[in-house]
């Protein structure tokens, strides 16, 4: 009996050498033993290898261009041409990444597909930013947004271009692999056009200088990103981020570009047989005819334009489109405010005249879809203050006069509603 006890005591894990007494569990196999601690360690190694494998990264099916357009259509009204352009560009971009990550997709000819960043042209409030945000949400990739006017060349007061990459890392919770597949949206890029068509001997640190500084990260480079924001922490360790697979969407209103395009097209259209179109048609469709030479004349440098081969144009939203923006998307503003009031047990009714008047006011202010929320806040703000204290109110009605004349919204009580239904 004592011999059997001694034999049990000498049983050891075949991997770490610990005895049966030193571990919680010792599992026996044909001539081998493994302890619970070694099992846990093996599980951790397998999980880590699986998380880092290319197959894991590309498991998620890439939506087709038609599916991307349909998804955008649920949230963004109009801009059909821009949606199609963006859908194809985004599909090709992430298809290219998947091909690079999966060796079996590489062909024998070793063709390397270049990155195609996107330039979006269109007036304020036409949906440029929202299109980019919706794309990132659909693809479930990190999204960072910055204003080009805040950027300056390195060494000058303002943000370095590396700070854009820091925002992307923050959006990815500092997961470098995830950040390297993200989307960066740079707005107001028309504001960094150089001041003159001809190169200047004076330094343009917030115009042409920023365009020059952006060239490398647009094309694809391994950038050193300061995790604490750069200039105030010179001794920090940098994070290396490869921008080869980061999709850049660069956008701007480009006010005045239509005149540049019109001048070029006007010269081409002189003489007998030339097509004559109205001034309104020219201004409406001008961006559709944009050429690289027009952007150079506007103030973008040729190298910068060359790194933005895909051009998507968006148009001003008219009254009908703005009314649809208010009511149709899945998260439309009217649906959002209806939900807020519904939480207080109140129904929101927007009369057709009110919707048209709100759209007209946004057009008058020149704010487009971006200004719709501010107008609704002006109308509904006082109501949302009163309603929580008014237990008998069941419905709020917004009429055209509430928008055009500042009339107070009609509050319908439960007794009044019963009287009207009777």
From Swiss-Prot:
Pfam family, one: zf-C4_ClpX
Annotated residues for binding of Zn(2+): 13, 16, 35, 38
An example Gene Ontology molecular-function term: protein dimerization activity
UniProt GO BP: cell division; proteolysis involved in protein catabolic process
Source organism, top-level taxon: Bacteria
Binding site for ATP: 123-130
InterPro entries assigned: AAA+_ATPase, ATP-dep_Clp_protease_ClpX, ATPase_AAA_core, Clp_ATPase_C, Clp_protease_ATP-bd_su_ClpX, ClpX_bact, P-loop_NTPase, Znf_CppX_C4
Keywords, in A-Z order: ATP-binding, Chaperone, Metal-binding, Nucleotide-binding, Zinc
Gene3D superfamilies to which the protein is assigned, alphabetical: 1.10.8.60, ClpX chaperone, C4-type zinc finger domain, P-loop containing nucleotide triphosphate hydrolases
Domain ClpX-type ZB: 1-54
GO CC list: HslUV protease complex
Description of how the protein assembles with itself and partners: Component of the ClpX-ClpP complex. Forms a hexameric ring that, in the presence of ATP, binds to fourteen ClpP subunits assembled into a disk-like structure with a central cavity, resembling the structure of eukaryotic proteasomes.
UniProt similarity note: Belongs to the ClpX chaperone family.
Task of the protein: ATP-dependent specificity component of the Clp protease. It directs the protease to specific substrates. Can perform chaperone functions in the absence of ClpP.
Protein name per Swiss-Prot or TrEMBL: ATP-dependent Clp protease ATP-binding subunit ClpX
Organism: Corynebacterium kroppenstedtii (strain DSM 44385 / JCM 11950 / CIP 105744 / CCUG 35717)
The gene coding this protein: clpX
